[in-house]
Amino acid sequence: MSEIKDVIVQGLWKNNSALVQLLGLCPLLAVTSTATNALGLGLATTLVLTLTNLTISTLRHWTPAEIRIPIYVMIIASVVSAVQMLINAYAFGLYQSLGIFIPLIVTNCIVVGRAEAFAAKKGPALSALDGFSIGMGATCAMFVLGSLREIIGNGTLFDGADALLGSWAKVLRLEIFHTDSPFLLAMLPPSAFIGLGLMLAGKYLIDERMKKRRAEAAAERALPNGETGNV
């Protein structure tokens, strides 16, 4: 259980691919103009990560070390092609919106990196969990950034959700505030850099505060009974 918990925590927070490793920044910065686009690409990447980790881990004993990278890329490309066709068939609006960034998942350093660093060394179940955790960590970062940019830029949240979830999802659209002229800077790439920088700073502050609390708790436990540590 401790290993499973560690894989989940590493993927979602401690080793977050977007906020710690800073991998996959091209789609992270380009697609997060709305929450729907961010969520769509994040879920697609999560599905690819999970399936490729599972497949590569299952075949790891039969994969020659000398040609493992080309084999990994072929597996990743096959899974991405299948996911691309699924999105094209069932979420065509999202497919048009994401465009080239769906097939570019093949070259995403996150996918190849987890295949080499984790799936090639661990069992299928744990590798699939690692892929899912890493993917969800990236999805959460993309969703937060996309939501902030959409709210600041358009005053809405989940605008165009029907492109991802179907016509019923139109009810998910929220108008946070009304604006006649959208704040274009929030929808352009510079705001993605600014937003990502603020998220990195926020994670750093949270980590430092948690580290300080753990140190204080450890110091209190180390004191003899009856002492408070106050002079």
Curated annotation (Swiss-Prot):
Where is this gene product found? Cell inner membrane
**UniProtKB keywords:** Cell inner membrane, Cell membrane, Electron transport, Membrane, Translocase, Transmembrane, Transmembrane helix, Transport
Q: Which Gene Ontology cellular component terms are annotated?
A: plasma membrane
Mark the transmembrane ranges. Answer: 18-38, 39-59, 63-83, 86-106, 125-145, 182-202
Q: Which GO terms describe its biological process?
A: electron transport chain
The EC number on file is 7.-.-.-
Among the Pfam families in the record, one is Rnf-Nqr
Q: How does it sit in the membrane?
A: Multi-pass membrane protein
Give the family this protein belongs to, as stated in its UniProt record.
Belongs to the NqrDE/RnfAE family.
Q: What does this protein do?
A: Part of a membrane-bound complex that couples electron transfer with translocation of ions across the membrane. Required to maintain the reduced state of SoxR.
Assembly and partners are described as:
The complex is composed of six subunits: RsxA, RsxB, RsxC, RsxD, RsxE and RsxG.
Q: Which PANTHER family match?
A: ELECTRON TRANSPORT COMPLEX PROTEIN RNFE, ION-TRANSLOCATING OXIDOREDUCTASE COMPLEX SUBUNIT E
NCBIfam families referenced in this protein's UniProt entry, alphabetically: PRK12405.1, rnfE
This one is known as: Ion-translocating oxidoreductase complex subunit E
What taxonomic lineage is listed for the species of origin?
Bacteria, Pseudomonadati, Pseudomonadota, Gammaproteobacteria, Enterobacterales
